[in-house]
Amino acid sequence: MRTKQPSQKEIAVKVGDDYKKYDRLLKKVAGIKTDWKHSKRSGWFQTGDIKKKRIYYFFPEEGGFKFTMVFSDKAIQLIKEENISDMVIQALESAKKYHEGTPFDLNAAEFEVKLVESLIAIKLQSMK
């Protein structure tokens, strides 16, 4: 059953201290437009768009969150060229590829604002 959209405070309480990392990202990256959506499978989740282009998905969980980005082949090539992170490259190489791209997930413990900023910049560059 679909419930009403959660408030920022409710999400912060559910996620816990790690919510501060996500909030920092929202304040650091210019132009992110967020929108709450609901699905039967995932419950409430937030999307992040820049200039009407989907950049990420944020799934709040009890005591943490999952942050997902979907990368095109072009973006993955740029990530490899920039040598962003071995962990990111290995995860993308082992992830299942879909028509819309290759998903990459970070949990709250793995989420680093600087890393995600770099991934967002590469994703935007690959969409030009």
Per-region residue spans from a language model:
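Short, Lys/Arg-enriched charge-dense amphipathic segments
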Residues: 1, 57-71, 107-109, 121-128
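Charge-rich, low-complexity N-terminal segments
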Residues: 1-41, 45-46, 90
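Intrinsic-disorder-associated interaction segments
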Residues: 4, 15-18, 81, 109, ...
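Short, conserved beta-strand/beta-arch hydrophobic-aromatic motifs that form part
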Residues: 39-100
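Well-ordered alpha/beta subsegment
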Residues: 92-128
